[in-house]
């Protein structure tokens, strides 16, 4: 999910929201869909919803992608990304990490990779059961009924599953437990 071309360039950032003057956010805003997609992906990483990604949350995502990463390496990765120095990755740092040297094709590839994680049986669609299994592996205690509601919110053809095009819509909407429960995007 992360851009392999990233580097570390000191500086500070604010956790009070997204700095409008951030060059990375300005670049991402050049495609409004891209920033919404990044926000949705950030929310998936930010399992507890506190607005930042911890090494534990990063580890859960990496494990779900089939990569067992030792805690020390996760902490080192966080330190390299964490310009604010608080031990977490905030949204602005996440956008910077995921937009440095990236174009729309890279974003599309990242979404395809994410889709393949959720499409456990590889049949080209994601069922409520597959969504449930992946979200639970990430620490999200959602029910099958909630997963069905999430899928129902973007299932344009009514087949009870989501294909890649519907998945892109779901990621853009940030469709997750918060939307299912009527809270809307965080």
Swiss-Prot record:
Disulfide bonds: none
Keyword match Calcium: yes
Binding annotation for Ca(2+) 2: 119, 121, 123, 125, 130
Ligand binding (Ca(2+) 3): 155, 157, 159, 161, 166
Record: residues binding Ca(2+) 1: 46, 48, 50, 52, 57
GO molecular function, one term: calcium ion binding
Record function comment: Potential calcium sensor.
Protein name: Probable calcium-binding protein CML25
GN (gene name): CML25
